[in-house]
Amino acid sequence: MHFIDQAEIEVQAGNGGDGIVAFRREKYVPAGGPSGGNGGRGGSVILVADPGLQTLLDFRFQPVIKAEHGAKGGPNHRSGASGADRLVRVPCGTMVFDTETGELLGDLVQPGDRLLVARGGKGGLGNAHFLSNHNRAPRQFTRGQPGERRRLRLELKLIAEVGIVGMPNAGKSTLISVVSSARPKIADYPFTTLQPNLGVVPHPAGDGVVFADIPGLIEGAHRGVGLGHDFLRHVERTRVLIHLVDGTAADPVRDYQIIQQELRAYGHGLSDKPQIVVLNKIDALEPQEVSERTQRLSMAAGAPVSAISAVARQGLEPLLQRVWQCLGRDPDLHRPAAASKIQPVRGQENLRIGVPLPSQNSEMSGYVYLGGGSAPRFAPDQVGH
């Protein structure tokens, strides 16, 4: 399925039905009064948020969406039938703009949210409406009013609590695939991910949290370079960002700084969101390299850095714990810990991962290893630089 997050459509509400001219004609009533009924109301076009949809692809094939017209009135004071409303399903997170004015008409976030985008025309009046003491046999009637017609721009912003951002090939798709049931395309080359991927990560409380894997950003993404500009909007609704950095890159700190600059340049509060900085692919590094790169990245970020290996499934539980804390959904620490659902890759059970420990001075005072086996904490001066 192709992911389409923008579309332009034209909506046309139904016209109101015309009123009619009719007179009562019955046996022994040669001069019956007016009996022309009113026309029916035209159908309206209404957008409805549907959690089962994740793309605006369908709107590429139906550029004009119409509702039914109202029926004309009938004799004997019968009103015409109203036209049926046209309910149009859109993904949750769809923002609707008037193309001509640029006005935001509505933001359909919750399942079942509705937005009236084109109102049906009122029905016309039959001649019975014009009966008066001065006009006992009126022949006036009115036609139904036309329904509203407008062009709309639909813009989809995915609804996820956690967004995963980073340079191409940082391991974002691998991470979301091991912590959720999402199955994005994964390959060892940049820009494997060409569209956002959503995954629901189980929470210890029993519910789930939606994560979004955003296609890789590169320098100049806020100006439309690469794929980033098209998809940065999808992290606007997130509450927390996981900033994934490739630990095997030539300069992880430089990669981190590039993404931070792009988030600031794009605006919309992205750089102000809480971030969890994560050094990935440490299974491909020596312990000393992990320690050095984690320390440097922590200094650049001014915050602790989680060191993980998504492919080896190491360090993921502590990372998720930090996510729950940022979301204010930290599980009850007093209840017995449930068995981890994230299992290490065979052969990697004893992989030792260096994770920085923050000191009271907000500088890194040491590291602790996560993974199989015991490893003592050690000070930075015990690590070769």
Curated annotation (Swiss-Prot):
GO cellular component, one term: cytoplasm
Keyword ATP-binding: no
Cofactor: Mg(2+)
Localization (cell): Cytoplasm
Domain OBG-type G: 160-328
Membership in a protein family: Belongs to the TRAFAC class OBG-HflX-like GTPase superfamily. OBG GTPase family.
NCBIfam families according to UniProt: Obg_CgtA, PRK12296.1, PRK12297.1, PRK12299.1
Protein name (record): GTPase Obg
Organism: Synechococcus sp. (strain JA-3-3Ab)
Gene: obg
